[in-house]
Amino acid sequence: MALVVKGKVNINEFIDLTKMEKILPSMFTPVKSVMCSKVDKIMVHENESLSEVNLLKGVKLIDSGYVCLAGLVVTGEWNLPDNCRGGVSVCLVDKRMERADEATLGSYYTAAAKKRFQFKVVPNYAITTQDAMKNVWQVLVNIRNVKMSAGFCPLSLEFVSVCIVYRNNIKLGLREKITSVRDGGPMELTEEVVDEFMEDVPMSIRLAKFRSRTGKKSDVRKGKISSSDRSAPNKNYRNVKDFGGMSFKKNNLIDDDSETTVAESDSF
């Protein structure tokens, strides 16, 4: 008798995309493709075992990309007569994690009297494609008080996962843009201009403080632009900074009529 997950796996039980994410083109969202894996099986012969499981079986991965294990459906079948005593605990494990409490992703207990069972796990985290190819997930099975002779299989387990495969984590849309370029300004952003502009970025401030504690001077301190090299601030914009003929305006979204460079598509 073949073991199958009855019906189709309902992806909506694991992934809730917003309306905006559904209509945006792929370049504006890291979600590239949602896939269901092929079934992987474990035939349990021992009372306690830790077995490798391929949760990405049949999933097409992207080179130098990521895969998110959004959800997992586990189906089990007891290969026993009716009304047998005992039970089993099934636990999904991420073998990369060294602390046991952090490696445990979810567990389930059921009695042997329940001939067939099914449960869902929602790990909902991503790993790199390189890690995924190393088959990082395992299943810990602990059968208790089931009296069967050695060498036989009291329990069969099958696994189907829902995965999100994508190339980049970055989302386009939140950008700084050049609003104007005047005569006499530099043809490119020099290191000094970039350093001073980055002073307004919170993470840059944190990095500067960290480097000062370790005795390393930030390049921002080494090369300040003289006041004669700077253009007068544009008072019409509150959040505008001018650097040698280029003015930057902080903006949450790129206007449709502005010149932008579109990032490389993550299609495959």
Swiss-Prot record:
It comes from Tobacco mosaic virus (strain OM) (TMV). One of its GO terms (cellular component) is host cell cytoplasm. It is found in: Host cytoplasm, Host cytoskeleton; Host cell junction, Host plasmodesma. One of its GO terms (biological process) is transport of virus in host, cell to cell. Transmembrane segments: none annotated. The keyword RNA-binding applies. GO terms for molecular function: double-stranded DNA binding; RNA binding. Residues 225-237 have a biased composition (Polar residues). Its main location: host cell. Residues 218-246 are annotated as: Disordered. InterPro entries: TMV_movement, Viral_movement. Binds to host RBCS at the plasmodesmata; this interaction seems required for viral systemic movement. In resistant plants, interacts with host MBP2C at host microtubules; this interaction prevents virus cell to cell movement. In resistant plants, interacts with host resistance (R) protein (e.g. tomato ToMV resistance protein TM-2(2), AC Q71BG9) at the host plasma membrane; this interaction triggers host defense responses leading to programmed cell death. Pfam families: MP (PF01107). The gene is MP. This is Movement protein. Belongs to the tobamovirus movement protein family. The keyword RNA-binding applies. Transports viral genome to neighboring plant cells directly through plasmosdesmata, without any budding. The movement protein allows efficient cell to cell propagation, by bypassing the host cell wall barrier. Forms a ribonucleoprotein complex with viral RNA. Binds microtubules and modulates microtubule stability. Can bind double-stranded DNA. Triggers host hypersensitive defense reaction in incompatible plants harboring resistance (R) proteins. The lineage of its organism: Viruses, Riboviria, Orthornavirae, Kitrinoviricota, Alsuviricetes. Keywords: Cleavage on pair of basic residues, Host cell junction, Host cytoplasm, Host cytoskeleton, Host-virus interaction, RNA-binding, Transport, Viral movement protein. Disulfide bonds: none annotated.
